[in-house]
Amino acid sequence: MKSIVTTFFGLIFSISLMAQVNPGDPWFGESCTSIMAGKAATVDGSVITAHTCDGNYRTWLRMEKAAEHADTAVYKVYKGTLHTETPWDMRKVELAGEIPQVAKTFAYLNTAYPSMNEKQLAMGETTFVGPDTLVNKNGMFLIEELQRIALQRCDNARDAITLIGGLIEEYGYGDHGECITIADKYEVWQMEILGA
C-alpha cells in the first residue's frame, strides 16, 4: 500500500510539474534557475548563490580590472549587451544613457549577467516576466547593467540592493520582471524588480 501511495503522489507531482512547462510559451527558456543558501543552510556556514542562464545569450566572459576614475567621469549605460559575440562586439548594442562614475570600481567577472566581484559579492538572475503593461519603455536600465554597476561599486549585498533600488528610482527600469539573488560572505538576498 505504501508503494502505491508513493507512486500516486510521485505521478501527481510529475504531472503538475510538466503542466508548468509549456514549450509553446513565448517565454519558454527565458526563466533561468537560481539557487540560494544562507549560512544556516550549509554545513560549513558558507553563503551560496548560483544560477543557470537558460536563455540564448552570450557565452564569452572576461575579468574586468579594478579602476580609478576622474571626478568628471561618466559611466555609459548600454542595452543589448546580452547578445554580443565578443567583448568588443557593439553591432546590436545601443547607448541608453549615462550616469556619474564613482572614484574607484572593483574588479568583476563580466558575463552575460555579471556574476561576482573581487570582494566576493555574487549575483544570480532569473527572469519571471510579467504583463507588458508593467514595462517602462523609457527606463534606462536592464538587469544586466544594474548587476554590472553594483558589482563595480559594492562590497556587500545590502549596499548592492540599495544602489540598484536607487538607480531604478532615479533612471527607471526598462524590462520585464527579474529576480536577482545577491550574496556576500555573510548573507544572501533575493530582489525582485518589475515595472519601475
Regions found by a protein language model. Give the residues of each.
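Bacterial Sec-dependent N-terminal signal peptides
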Residues: 1-21
